[in-house]
């Protein structure tokens, strides 16, 4: 299966640094049949990034509102996202859930606004360290996915990318063990299999949690890991490109 490598730039960068980053990423060579690339800049730089990257590199937004239009100061709608030429959308990132109190219902409502457009939604799920230690991992992940799996058709679900991000491993330098990553991805795939076996086999489940060049080969080689959602390492073109190179090599072996 084609690997999907995505960079979440979060609230980082300025016009100068982003131009340098785009220039660096534009240099990486990879087989587009084996690897797909996407980046998520801050919304004010999306148009700049689209114009500065090769067409083969997808560009997405980090968040939208679930309203269509109207008096919602500061918000961005799904229609606007499509209008400016975005390819991807992050939904439910752990920082949105923890810092802005986004609920599973909010995540579903945002997904519902985007699911029938040309934009690929990347739905983020993950557990806290307390959840894992108390044995609630499976319960938490199943709950986070329940509204989505119960209310979308198989055809709609097939458009979704799922990003598993253990909250305790994001931005901390702590990485889940390979066994933990594989077991969790396998569990997520088993939830999807209850809906449809073919869906479970073909849907992309990517890992996000301190993934970097030094551990990319091991993580991306796991059988149920279809790519990565990279944070800090995606802000350095050389490191992000090395992760892309590792993914490309894995898919050619």
From Swiss-Prot:
User: Subunit composition?
Assistant: Homodimer.
Q: In which pathway does it act?
A: Carbohydrate biosynthesis; gluconeogenesis; Carbohydrate degradation; glycolysis; D-glyceraldehyde 3-phosphate from glycerone phosphate: step 1/1
InterPro entries recorded: Aldolase_TIM (IPR013785), TIM_sf (IPR035990), TrioseP_Isoase_bac/euk (IPR022896), Triosephosphate_isomerase (IPR000652), Triosephosphate_isomerase_AS (IPR020861)
Gene3D superfamilies according to UniProt:
Aldolase class I
Instruction: Write the protein's name.
Output: Triosephosphate isomerase
Keyword list (alphabetical) reads: Cytoplasm, Gluconeogenesis, Glycolysis, Isomerase
Q: Provide the top EC class.
A: isomerase
What organism is listed for this UniProt entry? Francisella tularensis subsp. holarctica (strain LVS)
């Amino acid at each position: 299966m084609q690997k999907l490598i995505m960079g979440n730039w979060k609230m980082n960068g300025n016009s100068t640094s982003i131009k340098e980053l785009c220039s660096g990423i534009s240099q990486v060579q990879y087989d587009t049949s084996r690897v797909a690339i996407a980046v998520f800049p801050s919304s004010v730089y999306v148009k700049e990034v689209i114009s500065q990257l090769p067409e083969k590199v997808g560009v997405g937004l980090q968040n939208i509102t679930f309203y269509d239009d109207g008096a919602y100061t500061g918000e961005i709608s799904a229609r606007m996202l499509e209008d400016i030429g975005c390819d991807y959308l992050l939904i439910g990132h752990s920082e949105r859930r923890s810092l802005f109190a986004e609920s599973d219902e909010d995540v579903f409502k945002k997904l519902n606004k985007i699911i029938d457009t040309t934009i690929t939604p990347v739905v983020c799920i993950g557990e806290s360290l307390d959840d894992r230690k108390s044995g609630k991992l499976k319960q938490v992940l199943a709950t986070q996915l329940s509204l989505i799996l119960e209310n979308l058709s198989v055809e709609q679900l097939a458009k979704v990318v799922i990003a598993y991000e253990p909250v305790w491993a994001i931005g901390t330098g702590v990485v889940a063990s390979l066994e933990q990553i594989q077991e969790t991805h396998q569990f997520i795939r088993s939830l999807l299999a209850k809906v449809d076996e073919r869906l479970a086999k073909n849907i992309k489940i990517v890992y996000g949690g301190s993934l970097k060049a030094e551990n990319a080969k091991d993580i991306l080689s796991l059988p149920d890991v279809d790519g990565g959602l990279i944070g800090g390492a995606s802000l350095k073109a050389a490191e992000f490109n090395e992760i892309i190179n590792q993914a490309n090599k894995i898919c050619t072996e």
